[in-house]
Regions:
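Short amphipathic beta-strand starts and helix->beta connectors
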Residues: 54-61, 107-117, 202-212, 396-398
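Short secondary-structure transition/capping motifs
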Residues: 71-78, 109, 119-121, 128-133, ...
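Acidic, proline/glycine-enriched N-terminal capping motif
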Residues: 1-104, 115, 345
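Short, charge-rich binding segments
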Residues: 96-98, 107-113, 118-124, 163-164
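Conserved, structured C-terminal
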Residues: 1-35, 39, 122-463
């Protein structure tokens, strides 16, 4: 993603526009399905193998099979300073990190706001593998190349953007109440009980497979990965064995709803646009990078991009912040704000009568319609932030990732709310639809509507 000499940088873009929020609102938005099939191309993952409702349910009733080989960005970091680089950039501690361990790594800006997160694997001495969304990868790659660390990186882009037409690793996930029995059948023995985020090695279809106990939706599950060329044989064996357990392959439509099920904010606004110490990064990053071309949307209409940033505490990552590990990017800001009254991440369950009013609102021609509600996922912008207020109209937080969960028979969102309004069972109101002051050529003209919602746990399956 490094800047080519003839390409303007993100900093050039920021210097040329009057307001970044307005610019991001004007970026292309609208098609949820288009985004899903871009990240999981249809020649590899069907939008639906059966139907998205049964595919959502499988993780709770039988087994869900997720093919994760195509949509995530991967960065390999090799060299004697590999761990030192990540220790410098992330909030995590690495004192017990080593081969066959992994971390949920979180990278923050110097002022303590989240840039991105991902899973960091230690594959061998001095060899790490970071897997996740693109924003955090660009920051890691920039620092690997410019920070004076003795490392080399290999960029393995998601499939639709990958010049090699293949990935280094296949990556599958099996999850559901029958997943332990399936894994025992595939490997010939019960899966060993190992601590969270520890890797183990098993044999499936005669191939060595790296496995990690991991959940996408709060149920028993394992991530399985290995060399790309071994993927078809392993996949065939898993699918064949899964037939006895009514395992369902999960298509791209249902797959991306798992973030709501898990309560994971998969695409926070990356906190890269404003801090002066990150100017060199913005000069390195091209204006064509996703951070500049993805779209902002929703009813939350704040004037500054900083208003869309999250702290790691707000996203539920407080347990991985290790302030006592020494210096790292963002440490001073996080230490200074540690005792603050942080907003809290929750689930918001929409009132079904109000959901019906949204749909009723675009039936007929007698008035300006409500904003179209797409099922099962309606985040029509990359960063979709809807405003949330209390019964007196006071702003109390944001609502993101609108998703219909067949597992809950409910329309839900992830909320990040002021702590005074985050108690389970609290009633709040969110606003669905863009403000009339913002006209997008990618969205139909529509009116806003208020939606009552009830605060529930995140992950929502805990309610």
């Amino acid at each position: 993603m490094a800047l080519q000499e003839s390409t303007p940088s993100l900093q050039n873009l920021l210097d040329s526009i009057p307001n970044l929020v307005d610019h991001l609102y004007d970026n292309r938005k609208g098609s949820v399905l288009k985004d899903a099939v871009l990240r999981q191309p249809t020649q590899f993952v069907a939008p639906e193998f059966t139907n998205w409702r049964e595919e959502q349910m499988a993780c709770r009733t039988s087994i869900a099979f997720y093919d994760q080989s195509f949509h995530m960005t991967t960065t390999f970091i090799r060299g004697k300073d590999a761990v030192a680089l990540m220790n410098h950039l992330t909030v995590n501690s690495y004192t017990t990190f080593g081969v066959d361990r992994s971390r949920h790594s979180v990278v923050c800006s110097p002022d303590g706001y989240v840039i991105g997160d991902g899973i960091l694997y230690c594959l061998a001495p001095d060899e790490l593998c970071l897997v996740g969304r693109q924003a955090g990868h660009n920051w890691v790659r920039f620092n690997a190349k410019s920070g004076g660390f003795d490392v080399e990186i290999e960029e393995d882009e998601f499939m639709a953007d990958n010049p090699n037409g293949r990935r280094n690793f296949y990556r599958f996930q099996v999850e559901g109440p029958h997943a332990p029995a399936l894994m025992e059948q595939l490997t010939g023995a019960p899966m060993p009980q190992v601590p969270k985020l520890h890797l183990m090695h098993v044999t499936i279809a005669g191939r060595s497979v790296t496995a990690m106990q991991h959940t996408m939706a709060g149920n028993p599950g394992w991530e399985l990965f290995g060399p790309w060329d071994a993927g078809p044989a392993v996949k065939e064996a898993v699918l064949a064995a899964g037939e006895a357990y009514d395992m369902k392959r999960v298509g791209s439509v249902a797959y991306f709803t798992t973030a709501m099920e898990l309560g994971w904010v998969s695409r926070p606004m990356p906190a890269i646009f404003t801090h002066p110490e990150m100017k060199a990064f913005r000069e390195w990053l091209p204006e064509t990078a996703p951070e500049a071309t993805w779209a902002l949307g929703g009813s939350y209409n704040a004037p500054k991009v900083e208003d869309y940033y999250f702290t790691p505490w707000e996203l539920g990552y407080g347990n991985v912040i290790k302030l006592d590990k020494g210096e790292f990017v963002g440490r001073d800001a996080l230490a200074a704000s540690q005792g603050n009254d942080h907003r809290q991440k929750v689930s918001l369950v929409w009132n079904p009568e109000d959901v019906a009013k949204i749909i009723e609102g675009y039936m007929g021609h007698d008035q300006l319609p409500t904003r179209y509600l797409e099922f099962p996922r309606s985040n029509y912008a990359t960063w979709l932030y809807d405003g949330v207020h209390d019964g007196n109209g006071n702003h109390i937080g944001v609502s993101i990732y609108p998703t219909f969960l067949w597992t809950e028979r409910s329309m839900c969102t992830i909320g990040v709310l002021d702590s005074a309004h985050a108690a389970m069972g609290s009633e709040v109101t969110l606003v669905w639809g863009e403000p009339s002051s913002r006209k997008s050529k990618y969205l139909e003209p529509h009116r806003q509507i208020e939606i009552r919602a009830t605060v529930a746990p995140a992950p929502i399956g805990k309610r």
